[in-house]
From Swiss-Prot:
It comes from Thermus thermophilus. Residues 174-258 form the 5'-3' exonuclease domain. InterPro entries: 5-3_exonucl_a-hlix_arch_N, 5-3_exonuclease, 5-3_exonuclease_C_sf, DNA-dir_DNA_pol_A_CS, DNA-dir_DNA_pol_A_palm_dom, DNA/RNA_pol_sf, DNA_polI_H3TH, DNA_polymerase_1. This is DNA polymerase I, thermostable. It catalyses: DNA(n) + a 2'-deoxyribonucleoside 5'-triphosphate = DNA(n+1) + diphosphate. The gene is polA. Keywords: DNA damage, DNA repair, DNA replication, DNA-binding, DNA-directed DNA polymerase, Exonuclease, Hydrolase, Nuclease, Nucleotidyltransferase, Transferase. The lineage of its organism: Bacteria, Thermotogati, Deinococcota, Deinococci, Thermales. Belongs to the DNA polymerase type-A family. GO terms for biological process: DNA-templated DNA replication; double-strand break repair. It is an enzyme of class 2 (transferase).
């Protein structure tokens, strides 16, 4: 095989601070995993940064890592780097992969016991400089600024070059002054003490003024007394700090800068394929790029993949800027994109639903068909964006409509190949996700009517309530203050009123005023309840009441939310622009906001709500006979659970018992701990432990199912719904207890929540054509609710049909139950 083009000689040595770069990219790209749930963000980020540097500076390349053994600095100063957070659990495994990548690229890799990477880099840089090379050091570590010279520069990972001129412009210092400056100022990240009371600004000024530490101490009598005292008191720390800051340039290393190594191209290809770095396969030159497409006239043949670009993301509001179609190596571009839509019979492409919504807006009956995003999402629900999918499976998401069309065609073929043999995932694609995208397109284009006048009146009412709450808060505080200022609120609550500080913020360490903290303090002082009410009212006013009228489309007079099909880890739909999921269902103001969603004149809203669907799904998945029997016999699940837990007859269950049982019934689905339960029910911790134990005694197969689900998840790396939808949960095997427990809660909740989502989606797909026959519309899907709109004279028929379809969507061991309501608005339909 030919040598990679990125290794062409440049007369320059590139030194890479491997450990530093790996750690930096680990945090910069948090959340990037393979389809198996394997975290790879550090590997990907490292490879991208390295590749960019190799293309520009890659004649001789040496990658340096810190050795595991402590360095001489740890021996000189035990507290060196002592303040650093523990190494993240995922990092060592990714670091091993990075080293494997370096070896496959044929690059020199060095680790020297007893010395840090800085010392190795410094030695190599000075030696290469002496041999006549130009040197670039890829790092963001400021310790190495002391090495800068005419022939040594630092290449920052963000792409800019740090030279002696840059250093002088930014700090007013020369490279040979850097160690003295660091010795004075110290470095908290490495726990280098510096001189107490002297910060970076003062240290810069002193070194600029006196040139060096040596000269400064020779003229100490000319320094103002307060500074002189600090310097004299800190002489020992200063000497230590200078020793720790100085890098070694004389390590006994053997590196031949003239020797070149050949990369292992087959191994590199296998490595990148294993980690699903499709875009890097192209960038490293290991895959032939797509052949230049032959330009062809519009329109493309039926079945072509489309690419398009909008002026803004929301299809109901966007202008169609460009439209293209790709098919079998030919690229067709529409000269007039909007007119070009009229030549199409369907939409295949990335984000196909969005283009279909825009077409429906223009009066064209175009519906989405195949979408590679849906295939990618089924392979791994972390595949939520075109950029991420292109990066993982090969390609680049650009602004060009033609490139997007070609990418869609390639990705569809790649992803279909990956799904070969995955019959359950393919079934979900063909029977659920693909037809659902057609339903959602029509729902988005239809929208829902909004009573704007009502919202404007509600805004005035809520504004008056907010002002009244403000006055009450100020009266209780004894003076006015800015209720929206976290710092002012902190002072009022904890300093002036003396309330206990329960927690601190992660970033600043200040006393927390979060909702959770205030909830815990609600009984401590009447001001807390008023503040919580104030926050709820202002949040809903600013998020919904005031913005919603502006979102009504001038052409349709309706509100058009966007339904996101590839956004959640469980398979549930989400909505945005606006997000209707976040309107509270049970609070008075949340209900008043729902009142603004109204039916068209002569129509009514039909609202259908799956009753306790997740508990019914749990009964089916666990096979627990007691749980199944309760639902089969139509008994109240919370009353029956309380009866078994407390050892009383169902008639003897009081409201407190039922509340406890209800909290546990739903809490179990989300892994509620005894500590959380004790807080929810205001009972002792020991009693909460006993409650949970009695719950599992009442439903023994639920515990067995949870344990079995976790065991299977640990073995396979993922959990799945009744229909085979997957969620990868690699942290089930984490060593850190809190990380592992969080993964466990996700793992046994997902099959329940995801199955409920699958049932809702399947019901929508089956109900949609039946509604069209009756002239009814599907408007919204929020949580477990489906909101329809029907002509008044057909509303009862529509309601009966929808209930029948939703309850009979799939045979389970327990009946699905749907509550139905009709009304002129969303609120009255639920009452």
């Amino acid at each position: 095989m030919a040598m990679l083009p990125l290794f062409e000689p440049k007369g320059r040595v590139l030194l890479v601070d491997g450990h530093h770069l790996a750690y930096r990219t680990f945090f910069a790209l948090k959340g990037l995993t393979t389809s198996r749930g394997e975290p790879v963000q550090a590997v990907y980020g490292f490879a991208k940064s390295l590749l960019k540097a190799l293309k520009e500076d890659g004649d001789v390349v040496v990658v340096v890592f810190d050795a595991k053994a402590p360095s001489f600095r740890h021996e000189a100063y035990e507290a060196y780097k002592a303040g650093r957070a523990p190494t993240p659990e995922d990092f060592p495994r990714q670091l091993a992969l990075i080293k494997e990548l370096v070896d496959l690229l044929g690059l020199v890799r060095l680790e020297v016991p007893g010395f840090e990477a800085d010392d190795v880099l410094a030695t190599l840089a000075k030696r290469a400089e002496k041999e006549g090379y130009e040197v670039r050091i890829l790092t963001a570590d400021r310790d190495l600024y002391q090495l800068l010279s005419e022939r040594i520069a630092i290449l920052h990972p963000e792409g800019y070059l740090i030279t002696p001129a840059w250093l002088y412009e930014k700090y007013g210092l020369r490279p040979e002054q850097w160690v003295d400056y660091r010795a004075l100022a110290g470095d908290p990240s490495d726990n280098i003490p510096g001189v107490k009371g002297i910060g970076e600004k003062t240290a810069q000024r002193l070194i600029r003024e006196w040139g060096s530490l040596e000269n400064l101490f020779q003229h100490l009598d000319q320094v103002k007394p307060s500074l002189r005292e600090k310097l004299q008191a800190g002489m020992e720390a200063l000497a230590l700090s200078r020793k720790l800051s100085q890098v070694h340039t004389d390590l006994p290393l053997e590196v031949d800068f003239g020797r070149r190594r050949t990369p292992n191209l087959e191994g590199l290809r296998a490595f990148l394929e294993r980690l699903e770095f499709g875009s890097l396969l192209h960038e490293f030159g290991l895959l032939e790029g797509p052949k230049a497409a032959e330009e062809a006239p519009w329109p493309p043949p039926e079945g072509a993949f489309l690419g398009f670009s909008f002026s803004r993301p929301e299809p109901m509001w966007a202008e169609l800027l460009a439209l293209a179609g790709a098919w079998e190596g030919r690229l067709h571009r529409a000269q007039d994109p909007l007119r070009g839509l009229r030549d199409l019979k369907g939409v295949r492409g990335i984000l196909a639903k969005d283009l279909a919504v825009l077409a429906l807006r223009e009066g064209l009956d175009l519906f989405p068909e195949d979408d590679p995003m849906l295939l990618a999402y089924l392979l791994d629900p972390s595949n939520t964006t075109p950029e991420g999918v292109a990066r993982r499976y090969g390609g680049e998401w650009t602004e060009d409509a033609g490139e997007r069309a070609l990418l869609a065609e390639r990705l569809f073929q790649t992803l279909k190949e990956r799904l070969k043999g995955e019959e359950r995932l393919l079934w979900l694609y063909e029977e659920v996700e693909k037809p659902l995208s057609r339903v959602l397109a029509r729902m988005e284009a239809t929208g829902v009517r909004l009573d704007v006048a009502y919202l404007q009146a509600l805004s005035l009412e809520v504004e008056a309530e907010v002002r009244q709450l403000e006055e009450e808060v100020f009266r209780l505080a004894g003076h006015p203050f800015n209720l929206n200022s976290r710092d002012q609120l902190e002072r009022v609550l904890f300093d002036e009123l003396g309330l206990p500080a329960i927690g601190k913020t992660e970033k600043t360490g200040k006393r927390s005023t979060s909702a959770a903290v205030l909830e815990a303090l609600r009984e401590a002082h009447p001001i807390v309840d008023r503040i919580l009410q104030y926050r709820e009212l202002t949040k809903l006013k600013n998020t919904y009441i005031d913005p919603l009228p502006a979102l009504v489309h001038p052409k349709t007079g309706r509100l058009h939310t966007r339904f996101n099909q590839t956004a959640t880890a469980t398979g549930r739909l989400s909505s945005s622009d606006p997000n209707l999921q976040n309107i509270p269902v049970r609070t008075p103001l949340g209900q008043r906001i729902r009142r603004a969603f109204v039916a068209e004149e002569g129509w009514v809203l039909v609202v259908l709500d799956y009753s306790q669907i997740e508990l019914r799904v749990l009964a089916h998945l666990s096979g627990d006979e007691n749980l199944i029997r309760v639902f089969q016999e139509g008994r109240d699940i919370h009353t029956q659970t309380a009866s078994w837990m407390f050892g009383v007859s169902p008639e003897g269950v009081d409201p407190l018992m039922r509340r406890a049982a209800k909290t546990i019934n739903f809490g179990v689905l989300y892994g509620m701990s005894a500590h959380r339960l004790s807080g929810e029910l205001s009972i002792p911790y020991e009693e909460a432990v006993a409650f949970i134990e009695r719950y599992f005694q009442s439903y023994p197969k639920v515990r067995a199912w949870i344990e079995g689900t976790l065991e299977e998840g640990r073995r396979r790396g993922y959990v799945e719904t009744l229909f085979g939808r997957r969620r990868y949960v690699p942290d089930l095997n984490a060593r850190v207890k809190s990380v592992r427990e969080a993964a466990e809660r996700m793992a046994f909740n997902m099959p329940v929540q995801g199955t409920a989502a699958d049932l809702m989606k399947l019901a929508m797909v089956r109900l949609f054509p039946r509604l069209q026959e009756l002239g009814a519309r599907m408007l919204l899907q929020v949580h477990d609710e489906l909101v329809l709109e029907a002509p008044k004279d057909r509303a009862e028929r529509v309601a009966a049909l929808a209930k029948e379809v939703m309850e009979g969507v799939w045979p389970l061991q327990v009946p699905l139950e749907v509550e139905v309501g009709l009304g002129e608005d969303w609120l009255s339909a639920k009452e």
